[in-house]
């Protein structure tokens, strides 16, 4: 992606291969009757669909998805918004904008208008405390709310009531190489057997 040096950019092993191996090795231990520790996957996760896929890919061993850069960005943007709206706070919040860009101004020109979850945070901390809450924190909360809602929608579509119910059968591979590397069924093979049973009944 946008990593500043080669080691992060192209010297490493792609996350999907590491995750596939982690599952493979955990499965070997489980088959021997050994307890497999709860695993977490990291590397490139940014949205609810990637969280869903990561948990399903490592199921039943993966219990946590770690996010780095993807979850930091709202905090940075929130700080930039705060710095643009309050010049006197710009240095303290490490804001880099002198003014709000047009893309933000289309939503509004105050925190209450810009942040979809402003009033949700206000309900938690109280109206008087909102003056002490950094805009980066409000933005971070807003992304967390989006991820929560999106994950609920994906789980509903998969007819699962909890992420602990996810299995590797809840996803399929988009290409043969990924299917081969991960052991996840290719999209042309997923549900093929049940479709043929229906057609031949």
Where is each model-derived feature located?
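Glycine-rich phosphate/ribose-binding loops and adjacent secondary-structure elements
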Residues: 1-115
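C-terminal extensions of enzymes
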Residues: 73, 104-201
